[in-house]
Amino acid sequence: MTVVNAMPTYKDIAYASASPTQKLDLYLPEGDGPFPVVVDVHGGFMMGDKSNPAGTDELLANGYAVASVDYRLSGEAKAPAQIQDIKAAVRFLRANAGEYKLDPERFAAFGQSAGGNLVALLGTSCGVEALEGAVLGNADQSSCVQAVVDWFGPTDFLQMDQQFAGTSCPANHDDASSPESQLVGAPIQTVPDKVQFVNPITYVSAKAPPFLIQHGTADCNVPPQQSQLLYDALVSAIGADNVTLTLLEGASHGGAQFSDAANMQLVLDFLASNLK
């Protein structure tokens, strides 16, 4: 995991009031703005927090504001509360863009693992009312984003154990105690409709923004085929020029191959080309 050296410019901003969890930290680069925004979503579903957003030092050095968002974990609320929180955070930031020197027209989302699922869902479900959570505030604002960086996020939970078949990786996502089952409130294979409700592929359309998807070939937490499924669906909808899938040979569920300078440059180049 990359250690963030920067300190938040604003810490624990409440973006909604339904839960004390609904807070974000905002990191601003030097200058007067308005700054393009990268909304960082942590992994975990069941655990984790906003304290260590990925690539923040590099993003700040390149002129991006970073909003690191906490969301209700599955022990507090079941899906779709998590994506509704992320959308509420985006709407809050747009509504208060002037105060925080943000550019409301240039928003990207960046997430790892469970956060990858949530940013992919954020990207594909623009305008989907059932996932919006408008009651959380700023309903007049858009929650759409202009680019998505998805690091090893799961997509179709129902296929994960099948995709691990024949490998040395544990196939335990169908278990009642798995993060995915805890997210939807039941063993995933017993509630396929709930699972598809939070599958970003469900909402892929020609309206989807450009995506950079990265996954390690040796990931034993989320099968790399999960990213391939999303990539294939996006290519069909928005064209191969707007979607990049990078499979990092030998990389596991995160690690140095994602956060090293060469790979972070790929992320920065992608953001620069899509947040002009």
Task: Please give the residue ranges for each predicted region.
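N-terminal cap/lid segment of alpha/beta-hydrolase-fold proteins
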Residues: M1-D32
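Mobile cap/lid helix-loop segments that gate and shape the active-site cleft of serine hydrolases
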Residues: T2, Q159-Y203
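Short substrate-entry loop that stabilizes the transition state in hydrolases
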Residues: G33-F35, V41-K78, E129-L131, L158, ...
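Alpha/beta-hydrolase active-site loop
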Residues: A77-G98
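Primarily recognizes the serine-hydrolase "nucleophile elbow" in alpha/beta-hydrolase
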Residues: R91-A165
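Short beta-strand/loop motif that positions the catalytic acidic residue
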Residues: L212-H215, D219
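Conserved alpha/beta-hydrolase "acid-adjacent" motif
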Residues: C220-L229
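Catalytic histidine-centered segment of alpha/beta-hydrolase-like enzymes
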Residues: A251-A261
